């Protein structure tokens, strides 16, 4: 919000990744639109590398007040009922822990060149644009563009804990490719870490905590899309180092500091944090050699410490 981008564009897998945005007494659970939709001055775009569930997208545009500024690239792939059915049974569901959204089977059909595209769907006709073209027009006018990804680095099809991964590449380079943005046009890469590690479904997790320990620490969470309880472990510096390397990160954002340090809830300046929280942030910076510039201290969009100059 502070950076006032004229475009907020989503790359990544979709709609198997859910994001929760809180604005006062309103809670938005998002699967298709980028979280930056709250910025009323920004166009909200979905890049051509993203697969789209038209029903979910149209519902979000209507319910979240994004009509007239939400658009979809003509080359976005389309999730159909057959993809959801394939995703909700068999090994994908039972062994990999798929969310059942149809994302994986749709991406598989895209690789086989049989997937329908957004430009072929009548209900999306008034939302169809050329997303890369709009992005580059904005950049030529020296406007800010915010590119938002989905999932996490270690759910990447190439770099993650295969086979317990999502169906495509979700590191920064993959997200940029999804929206048609070349590497020389990227100014900053902000890698987002929770103050502890979570994972939904199956797959490896170092130093995983028992459910009782998770509850005792107050770290209990449930997936936005599936509602399944999230597994948890303490902050993992080795994973963080690897994520920074794979994403060429220039800044770190830490979320849920208030869950780890409840006294920090709602704070908006670093000086207000208690000593334990300050030491936690300093240890991250000293160990990872990257500045922590954004700190989330609560679910509301305004519960943020922004340390950028």
Regions found by a protein language model. Name each.
Residues 1-309:
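Non-transmembrane, aqueous-exposed alpha-helical and coiled segments at domain scale
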């Amino acid at each position: 919000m502070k950076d006032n981008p004229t475009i907020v564009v989503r790359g990544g897998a979709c709609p198997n990744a859910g994001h929760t945005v809180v604005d006062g007494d309103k809670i938005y659970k998002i699967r298709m639109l980028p979280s930056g939709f709250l910025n009323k001055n920004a166009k909200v775009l979905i890049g051509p590398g993203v697969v789209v569930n038209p029903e979910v997208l149209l519902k979000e545009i209507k319910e979240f007040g994004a009509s007239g500024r939400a658009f979809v690239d003509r080359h976005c792939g389309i999730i159909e009922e057959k993809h959801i059915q394939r995703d909700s049974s068999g090994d994908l569901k039972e062994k990999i822990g798929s969310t059942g959204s149809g994302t994986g089977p749709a991406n598989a059909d895209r690789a086989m060149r049989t997937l329908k595209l957004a430009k072929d769907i009548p209900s999306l006709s008034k939302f169809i644009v050329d997303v890369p073209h709009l992005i580059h027009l904005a950049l030529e006018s020296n406007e800010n563009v915010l590119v938002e990804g989905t999932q996490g680095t270690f759910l990447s099809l190439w770099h993650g804990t295969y086979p317990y991964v999502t169906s495509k590449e979700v590191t920064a380079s993959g997200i940029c490719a999804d929206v048609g943005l070349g590497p020389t046009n990227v100014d900053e890469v902000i890698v987002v870490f929770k103050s502890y590690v979570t994972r939904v479904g199956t797959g490896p997790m170092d130093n995983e905590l028992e459910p009782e320990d998770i509850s005792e620490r107050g770290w209990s969470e449930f997936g936005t899309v599936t509602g399944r309880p999230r597994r948890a472990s303490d902050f993992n510096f080795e994973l963080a180092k690897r994520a920074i390397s794979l994403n060429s990160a220039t800044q770190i954002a830490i979320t849920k500091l208030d869950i780890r340090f409840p006294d920090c809830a709602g704070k908006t300046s670093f000086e207000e944090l208690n000593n334990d929280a300050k030491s936690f942030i300093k240890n991250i910076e000293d160990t990872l050699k990257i500045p922590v510039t954004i700190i989330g201290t609560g679910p509301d969009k305004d519960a943020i410490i922004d340390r950028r100059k």
